Amino acid sequence: MALEPIILIPARMGSTRLPQKALAEISGKPMIVHVAEQAKKAAIGRTIVATDHNDIAKAVAEYGHEYIITRGDHKSGSDRIYEALMRIDPEQRYNAILNIQGDLPTIMPREIIHALRPLENSFTDIATLGSQIIEESEKRDPNVVKIIGTPLSQNRLRALYFTRTTSPYGDGPLYHHIGIYAYRREALEKFVSFKPSTLEIREKLEQLRALEHNMRIDVEIVDTIPLGVDTQRDLERVRKILA
């Protein structure tokens, strides 16, 4: 079956480490607008911001992007995009749903395209991205999520686990997980039906919920890592990059 993708960008106002970060100004535009612009440049399908706040919706609309207002009580971005999908597409026209975090203003369109590739394998439930860790400090940084996976090809892994620790042990590359997901529609429906899992809660990584329920996640390896904005320091770095 051919893939019919839609891009959904979850964006909430209540960030704890960097309040109102979706609206943080970067080169004259709110951060969420930068993400939406990059997603549209990928030209793979309809792009919609799913948000819980009117101020984010207004900012997105001012730059000509589509949005939908969702409930404010969602526990994860996946839950938010699922609500959005059910309301936007009850006819089930879209069978591949890309979840792009709203705090990745440096994401490149080619990386969004690459995130879809593992879904070409009909056995893959969820696709995501990773990149080899080069900086030694990142190997020990708990904010850098590592992928433990078995190689499927030169540029693809099957994920066995995700962790904040330095892993796996021994010689060989370590991979940094990039928080972009491409779900088969039925996989997203299945994922959100499960309660948060034991390891998900412990590691604070929602993708572990899928692995704990025997869902298959394949990882496309790319050359660059988009900078996620979680702190004021991250924001200042991104402002310099996009100046």
Curated annotation (Swiss-Prot):
EC number: 2.7.7.38
Gene3D superfamilies in the cross-refs: Spore Coat Polysaccharide Biosynthesis Protein SpsA, Chain A
Keywords for this protein: Cytoplasm, Lipopolysaccharide biosynthesis, Nucleotidyltransferase, Transferase
Localization per Swiss-Prot or TrEMBL: Cytoplasm
Main location: cytoplasm
Enzymatic class: transferase
InterPro entries: Cytidylyl_trans, KdsB, Nucleotide-diphossugar_trans
Catalyses which reaction(s): 3-deoxy-alpha-D-manno-oct-2-ulosonate + CTP = CMP-3-deoxy-beta-D-manno-octulosonate + diphosphate
Domain of life: Bacteria
GO MF annotations, alphabetized: 3-deoxy-manno-octulosonate cytidylyltransferase activity
GO biological process: one example: CMP-keto-3-deoxy-D-manno-octulosonic acid biosynthetic process
Pfam families: CTP_transf_3
Disulfide bonds: none
One Gene Ontology cellular component: cytosol
Annotated metabolic or biological route of this protein: Nucleotide-sugar biosynthesis; CMP-3-deoxy-D-manno-octulosonate biosynthesis; CMP-3-deoxy-D-manno-octulosonate from 3-deoxy-D-manno-octulosonate and CTP: step 1/1; Bacterial outer membrane biogenesis; lipopolysaccharide biosynthesis
UniProt similarity note: Belongs to the KdsB family.
Function recorded in the entry: Activates KDO (a required 8-carbon sugar) for incorporation into bacterial lipopolysaccharide in Gram-negative bacteria.
Family matches, as HAMAP family: KdsB
Protein name: 3-deoxy-manno-octulosonate cytidylyltransferase
Native source species: Bartonella tribocorum (strain CIP 105476 / IBS 506)
